[in-house]
């Protein structure tokens, strides 16, 4: 094998490695970027940093309900605070499960009373001031801290923006 040919093969291998690494970084960025920045969704402002709790310290965030998520295979939850039009506080949570079945198990265990099915992700329910949906191995919950006529369309818009960012 000539020196020039070896150099050619090494160049191709290097290009393949760079492309593969870039694809991996894009997937990681997409997952960590599931929370829209301020102004990306009309009326919504991100009011704090994203916090993440892994399975070992999930109880610090959802004390009393962590066991249900652990049994369903939760890996972590990321959470972020928002404010809608300067007056309605809300929190958005993205639970990363080991499988889509785990996300489905938690989704199906949620109460269906007073819920309206909506088209988002694989399955979604809209309540008076909250939205829960699942997409692949992710379960997302958005809760607004007051109820008003504009809250439901607002959390639907935020939810759709988040669903677009989640991998299938």
Task: Describe the predicted segments one by one.
Residues 2-12:
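Bacterial N-terminal signal peptides that target proteins for export
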Residues 11-20:
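Bacterial N-terminal signal peptides
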Residues 24-88, 113-117, 139, 147-168:
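N-terminal "mature-domain start" segment
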Residues 36-39, 95, 133:
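Residue-level signal for helical boundary/lining positions with a hydrophobic bias
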Residues 78-83, 87-111:
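Post-signal peptide N-terminal segment of secreted/secretory-pathway proteins
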Residues 98-102, 125-126, 139, 146-150:
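Solvent-exposed loop/turn segments at secondary-structure junctions
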Residues 100-135:
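Short, internal acidic amphipathic alpha-helical interface segments
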Residues 132, 139-142:
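Structural recognition of the beta-strand scaffold that forms the well-ordered cores
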């Amino acid at each position: 094998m000539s020196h020039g040919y070896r150099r050619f093969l090494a160049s191709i291998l290097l290009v393949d490695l760079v492309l593969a690494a870039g694809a991996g970084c894009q997937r990681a960025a997409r997952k960590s970027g599931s929370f829209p920045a301020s102004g990306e969704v009309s009326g919504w402002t991100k009011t704090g940093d994203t916090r993440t709790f892994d399975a070992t310290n999930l109880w610090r965030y959802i004390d009393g309900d962590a066991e249900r998520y652990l049994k369903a295979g939760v890996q972590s939850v990321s959470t972020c605070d928002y404010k809608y039009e300067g007056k309605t506080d809300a929190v958005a949570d993205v639970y990363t499960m080991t499988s889509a079945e785990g996300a489905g198990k938690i989704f199906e265990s949620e109460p269906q009373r007073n819920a309206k099915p909506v088209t988002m992700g694989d399955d979604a329910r809209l309540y008076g001031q909250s939205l829960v949906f699942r997409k692949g191995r992710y379960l997302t919950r958005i809760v607004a801290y007051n109820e008003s006529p504009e809250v439901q369309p607002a959390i639907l818009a935020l939810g759709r923006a988040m669903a677009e960012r989640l991998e299938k």
